[in-house]
Design a protein with these regions (language model features):
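Transmembrane beta-strands of outer-membrane beta-barrel pores
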Residues: 10, 20-22, 31-35, 84, ...
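Transmembrane beta-barrel wall of Gram-negative outer-membrane proteins
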Residues: 1-40, 44-61, 65-88, 95, ...
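Gram-negative outer-membrane beta-barrel transporters
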Residues: 163, 342-488
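C-terminal beta-signal and adjacent terminal beta-strands/loops
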Residues: 422-423, 478-485, 506-578
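Outer-membrane beta-barrel transmembrane domain signature of Gram-negative proteins
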Residues: 65-77, 83-87, 96, 105-237, ...
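Outer-membrane beta-barrel proteins
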Residues: 1-15, 56-77, 133-147, 215, ...
Length: 578
């Protein structure tokens, strides 16, 4: 099963507000529930390590494991805001949100349990095939946050001030799966096989998380900010801001911003900004761990994704995760060519230090200290989240708008937008004694650097038009995605493509609006993948004989597709306002 997952979704949004005293009480509730089903790789019956007495696999014809995910998003907000007569205002609010995903693997089997039933319990072939479970709960994850915000704005002379504070709690939980989903039944605690044949443990396709990888973590954050805007002269506007954040996990950080806007003439303005920034390690990067079956270089191995604060990470000498730090510079100009036509051009540079990435699978033979640590953890390889790279991004944004065009008796506005961006990794480092002898490209290499540098087009250009007449509106957009390159089993560059979107709507006087729209109406798809062996594949019988060969297992790259590979999408709909 190749392509998008089968999906069913329900979404509800409620907004409300009412006058209360001198201000407004407001709030919203959102809920989204989605059930997805996707396929893993097909398991052929040969070579499972779980052949029964009749010589056949426990699942005679093989199977396609299915990954089922139940996704729930829920959030609500309650706030109160007041605007005062002296041009000041305050807003206080509470927000809660959570996202949870429960994974179940179905149409699958834990091969090692077949060996347990066969050699450990002495069941017959028929009894084993009747009793082996084909489904298991793999694990659940939930990410949540709750915040209390206070914002106050006022004017002091010619200076506009904004002050604010926030209290936030982040939570993250991992719920262990059913024992059947993760357990290796035919291996002892020392990792040695206990039966005449040995099979992979855990349910095939999407193995579960054991209790040792379960998590229930939280952190608290307190933040303050101040923002000031000063009209220095009629032509020069100056803005400055400072923000302080204190995390109970890794400490505090202070960041700044300075921006200015200079009107050189009535039709020409210059603008620029300089700022520092940060991104704290996400809860997932800090606390996710799992031992699973992965394919490294086409070979199936047992490997682990270990927490950055795990015993193995400490044995290797991997430092605790810290925040990413950034420096941002921008300089631009706005030209009003006429009352109907303007052009804006902005250049920018973003440098990010200590960027967090997940390492390659680090196995035996790379360093003595790493070998010893892997042996102690009972793993053949390990991946870790590391502050391991620095990056530099340079780019330019161009936006031009031409409005008030008379077309078919209506008004039309045309917008041209272009973005040119290049990102380079300027440094790869490990900060670990055990990893120091290992070449950087083996710590973070292969296709992973290309994810940051080349997987997305360096240029995107769009030309769109918005037209309206009486109750009719129409929108058409041409979007050009530039070339991009992926690394799979070798580099492949995919050509530029132009996509066309169209939407037409009509609004009735009673609040009812109907629309018809098409996305990618000319059914454009990316170039087909040519350099990956995963493009083709064979299906074998239990005897190891080839039953069928398919040249197009993956027709399109499964690594990157900036505009997808589903082609045209059409829809009609209606909205009603009351």
């Amino acid at each position: 099963r190749i392509g998008d997952a089968d999906s069913e979704q329900l979404a509800i949004v409620v907004n409300a507000g009412m006058a209360l005293g001198e201000g407004e009480l407001y709030g919203f509730i959102t809920y989204s529930g989605r059930d997805n089903t996707s396929g893993a790789f097909y398991r052929n019956p040969a070579g499972s390590g779980a052949a029964l007495d009749d010589g056949e696999n426990v699942v005679v014809d093989g199977f396609l494991p299915l990954i089922n995910s139940e996704i729930d998003d829920f959030s609500y907000n309650l706030g109160y805001r007041v605007d005062f007569d002296d041009n000041s205002a305050f807003d206080v609010s509470y927000t809660y949100g959570r996202n949870s995903i429960d994974y179940t693997t179905s149409n699958s089997a834990n091969y090692s349990f077949a060996n347990e039933l066969n050699f450990g319990q002495g069941l017959t072939d028929a009894e084993i095939r009747a009793q082996i479970p084909r489904e298991a709960f793999a694990y659940g994850i939930e990410l949540g946050l709750q915040t209390i915000n206070f914002d106050y704005t006022t004017s002091v002379g010619d200076i506009f001030l904004a002050l604010g504070a926030e209290l936030r709690e982040d939570t993250y939980t991992i719920t262990a799966g059913d024992e059947y989903s993760y357990r290796d039944y035919d291996t002892d605690e020392a990792g040695q096989g206990i039966y005449p044949q040995n099979a992979s443990g855990g349910i095939q396709g999407f193995p579960g998380v054991s209790p040792s990888s379960a998590a229930d973590e939280s952190r608290n954050v307190i933040s303050f900010y101040a923002d000031a805007e000063y009209q220095v002269t009629d032509a020069f506007l100056l803005n400055g801001a400072i923000r302080y954040d204190d995390y109970d996990g890794f400490g505090d950080t202070t960041n700044f911003k300075l921006a200015g806007n200079l009107r050189v003439t009535d039709n020409f303005r210059l603008r620029g900004a300089a700022s520092t920034g940060f991104r704290a390690p996400s809860m997932q990067q800090l606390y996710f761990s799992n031992i699973s079956t992965q394919f490294i270089g086409g070979v199936q191995v047992e490997t682990g994704t270990f927490r950055n604060d795990s015993q193995l990470a400490r044995a290797i000498g991997i430092p605790e995760l810290k925040e990413e730090e950034s420096t941002n510079l921008s300089l631009g100009a706005v030209v009003d060519i006429s009352d109907r036509w303007n052009i804006a051009v902005d250049f920018y540079k973003i440098e990010i230090d200590d960027r967090i990435v997940i390492s390659n699978n680090l196995g035996f033979g790379l360093s003595d200290a790493l070998d010893a640590a892997l042996i102690s953890a009972g793993a053949s390889g390990g991946q870790f989240f590391l502050n391991a790279i620095d990056t530099e991004t340079d780019g330019v944004d161009i936006v031009s708008t031409f409005g008030d065009i008379n077309v078919l008796g209506g008004d039309m506005t045309v917008t041209f937008a272009a973005n040119f961006t290049n990102t380079d990794i300027t440094r790869i480092f490990s900060n670990s004694p055990a990893l120091a002898p290992i070449p950087p490209e083996q710590i973070f290499g292969g296709f992973q650097p290309s994810v940051i540098e080349t997987w997305q087009p360096e240029d995107r250009i769009s030309l769109s038009g918005n037209w309206s007449r009486d109750n009719w509106t129409a929108h058409v957009a041409l979007q050009r995605y530039g070339e991009y390159t992926t690394e799979d089993e070798g580099p492949q560059t995919y050509g530029a493509e132009i996509l066309t979107d169209l939407r037409v709507s009509y609004e009735f006087d009673n609040g009812l609006s109907v629309f018809a729209s098409g996305i990618n109406i000319f059914d454009v798809v990316p170039d087909e993948v040519t350099n990956s062996s995963s493009r083709g594949g064979s299906f074998e019988s239990a005897a190891g004989l080839e039953d069928m060969f398919s040249p197009t297992v993956f027709r399109y790259s499964r690594r990157s597709a900036p505009f997808g590979f589903n082609g045209a999408y059409w829809s009609v709909g209606a909205t009603f306002s009351f």
